Amino acid sequence: MRRAVSKILPTPKLFNDSAHFHSNFRLEYNSVDDFYVQLDNPHKVWLPGEEISGQVVLISKKNLANIVITLSLVGFIKINASSHSKLRPLKHTLFDYTIKIYGKDEEEQTDSAEFSNGLLKGEHVFPFIVKLPNKRVYTSIDFGKGSINYILKAAIGNSSSYVIPASPDNASTSSLTKKKILQNPSHTSEKVISLVNPIDVSLLPRPKPKRLILKDPRTSSNKKLSRTQTSTSTINTMSSNEHDHSLPEGATPEDSDHKSLKSIPVPTIKAILEVPQRGYLRGESIPIKLSINHLRKIQDFNGIIITFVRVCRLDNGPDGVVESFRKDLQQLILPLYVDPVTFQSEINSSLRVPADAFPTILGCPLVSFQYFVEVLINLSGKSIALDSDVDARAKANPQATKSSSDKFKFNFDSTQTERSTYINTDSYKRSKKFLQLTTEIYIGTHRSSTQEEQAPQAEEVASRRSSSMASNSNSSPAVFSTSSPHSPVEHQYAGAINSIPESVAVSNFTPPYENVVPSYVPPEFVSHLQNQSELSEKERMRQHESSLLPSAPPDDEQPSPVNMTSNQQPFSFFTYQNTNTSPPVPLDDDLYQEPVDSAPNYLNVNNDRLIVPQDNNSNSET
C-alpha cells in the first residue's frame, strides 16, 4: 500500500531533491517528437539582401526546461574528392551567422539547478526573419565535383551546452561580443536555400574584336636580308661620297631603313572574330561574325568549327592543385569559301545559349565558371574529315546499333545525347593547319532596359506608324499614276532599305519595285473564253477536248512572258540582316604563338573534359 501511494504522491524527501526533480524536465533525444524548419516561400529563388521569413517548429513529448534554440545562416563551398583527380576534399565557409531564438538572456546568471525557461508538452512555433548578406554571395549550384550551398540550420539543446568556443577570434574580443554556439545539440534541422547572384548583361561593356595575324616566315627572312644589304651599301656610300649623300641632322641610317621597310606591304593572313555584346541570357542567340583575309583561294566544306564552351576551374588554395574542366554546350560546323578575286570571306552565324546554362560565377574562392566562344579555322586549304567520338565508336563496333523499337522511344536526356556527338577539337588545336580565336561570354540573369535601348525602340515604333500611314495612302489611285514618279513615299521606302546593312556586298542594287506600272496583257485563254458564245456546240466540244490534250512546248522564236517588255526589270530577291550597325570598336590583337588558357589539353571525364596543364619539363599527360 505504501509503495502504491508513493508512486502517486511524491515523498517530501523526493520533492526536496532538486537534482532528481530537474532531471525529469531535462531535454533528451527521445523527448522531441519532431523538429524542423518551415519557410513561408520554400520554392523561391532568393537574391542577396532579401529577407527570409519562416518558423522553427518543435513538437515535444514531455515538458522541457532549460533549453536553447538557435538558428544559423551558413554559406560554404565544398570540393569533393575523386579517384581520377588530384584535388583533396575541402570546405570553405563564406559566412556563418547564428542567432538565439529561444533561451535565457546572456545577462541572467542563474544556477544550473534552477529553472530559467520551460516549454509544456505539445507543439511550439518560433517565427524568424533572416536577412541575406549582400557581399560574398555567389549562385548556389551542385556540379558533382563540388557545390556552393546556403542553408538555414536550427538546433536545440540544453542551456548548459550553449557556451563560448575556444577560438582565436573569441580570445581577442570582449566578453559581450564573443560568439556562442550550441555544442552537441540533441536535434538539428537544415533547410537548403536557392540563391542567385544577379548579373545585368546590359551593363557589361562591349567586347573588343579578336584579331589574329599571320605573316609568311619566308617574307620576314627576306626582309632581314634586304635590311642588312641596304645598311651596308649606305655605309659605303657615306665613306666615299660624304658630301653628296649626307643625311639630315638627327637622322641615322637605321631610321631610313625602317622607313623603307614600312613602305613595303607585307602579305598577311588575317582573321577577325566579332561578337556584338558581352553578355546574353539563357535561350538567346549569340551572333558571330568572322572576317577572313587570305593569300589564295580556299574551299573547305568543314573549314570552320564554332563551339560554345563552359570551363570550370577548381582551386585547392595557394599550396594546392588547380584543375580545369571543359564542357561543350553548342557546336557548329560551317564551310569556308574564300573569294578567288578578293581573297576575302565574311561568315555570319549564331549560337544559342542552352536552357540548362547557369550564370557566370567569378570571384569565388575555390571554384569559377566561365563561358567562351571558341572558333577553329582551317586556313591551310586542305580538307580534313571531321569524325565525332560517337562515329569513331560506331565504326569500331558496327554491331552496337539501336534496334527499330529503340529509335521511337522518347529520350529524356536528349540534350546530353546531342552533346555526345560533338567533335573533340583537342586534336585540331594541336594541328598547325587550324587557327584558334576565343572570346569570353557572360551568361547573366536579366537584362534591364536602358535609355539607349529605349530610344531605338521609340524610333522603331514611329517608323512603323509612318509606314502604316504610307501603306494606307498607297491605296489611292493617284499614287499609281506615272505623272509623279518621285513621290515622298517612294523616297521613304528607299531610305529604309538603304539603312539596312546587307550581309553580302551587292553592286547596282535596285529595290524590288518599279516606278512605272507595267501594262496589263490578258492571256490568250481569256479571249478564247469570251468568243465561245459565238461558236456552235460541236466547236465548243472540240476546244474542250483540245484543252485536255498535252500542251506543246512554245516555239523558240516566241518571246517569253518574262521578257515581253524590254524596259521592265525583273523582280530581284535580296537578303539582309535586320541588325543595327555598331560603331567601330578598337581591335584586340592576339598572337597565334601565345598559349591560350581556355584551350589546353584535356581528357574525357564524365562527359566533361579535364584540362591538364602542360609541363615544360615533361610532355606526358596525366
Curated annotation (Swiss-Prot):
Q: Which residue windows does the record flag with biased composition (Polar residues)?
A: 477-486, 560-582
Q: Which GO terms describe its cellular component?
A: cytoplasm; cytosol; plasma membrane
Q: Where is the composition biased (Basic and acidic residues)?
A: 535-545
Ranges for region Disordered: 210-261, 445-489, 529-622
Q: Which InterPro entries match?
A: Arrestin-like_C, Arrestin-like_N, Arrestin_C-like, Arrestin_domain-protein, Ig_E-set
Any single biological process term in GO: symbiont entry into host
Please give the record's induction comment. Answer: Induced at acidic pH.
Instruction: Please name the GO terms that the record assigns under molecular function.
Output: protein-macromolecule adaptor activity; ubiquitin protein ligase binding
Give the family per the record: Belongs to the arrestin family. PalF/RIM8 subfamily.
The identity of this protein, by name, is pH-response regulator protein palF/RIM8
